[in-house]
Amino acid sequence: MLPPPPRQPPPQARTARGSLRLQRAFLRGPLGVLRLLQLLAGAAFWITIATSKYQGPVHFALFVSVLFWLLTLGLYFITLLGKQELVPVLGSRWLVVNVAHDLLAAALYGAATGIMIDQTQRHSYCNLKNYRLPCAYHAFLAASVCGGLCLGLYLLSALYGCCRRYQGKEEVV
């Protein structure tokens, strides 16, 4: 009679998804800091607009700010978790996708800031000392400043991405 074969440990189950690890280099790097600042300034922009009485072209400014706030939030967390390869078609060109996002955001934030500056000037009549009726002048002025800040931050991150691409680097981090 033959001895029983030696017992082998069962094969380890492979997970379909890799483990989540934070990309600390991104978090501490210039693009990670710029993304956080973009999220803060963008939130200030759309919250300031949303809490005031607005109409007309201000709807476009609110749309742009919320859209790019959500897109930036998505880019930030996908890059932070290092899961850009899971994005179909675009994951292999993640640096180019980030630069295109930043340039488009800068262009549309420029238009939104122009709208807010125009609305601020149209409501400047209620900036008088003894004006008692409710007015959106201060909210529009704050939104104009936040929009200009967003525009500058997105231009900076686009410039940073272009510099990385020019140096021959393919990764965001």
From Swiss-Prot:
Signal sequence bounds: none
Biological role stated in the UniProt entry: Microtubule-associated protein that exhibits cell cycle-dependent localization and can inhibit cell proliferation and migration.
N-acetylmethionine modification, residue list: 1
Keyword Membrane: yes
UniProt keyword Metal-binding present: no
Predominant localisation class: membrane
Annotated membrane topology: Multi-pass membrane protein
Top-level taxon in the UniProt lineage: Eukaryota
Protein name per UniProt: MARVEL domain-containing protein 1
PANTHER family hit by this protein: MARVEL DOMAIN-CONTAINING PROTEIN 1, MARVEL-CONTAINING POTENTIAL LIPID RAFT-ASSOCIATED PROTEIN
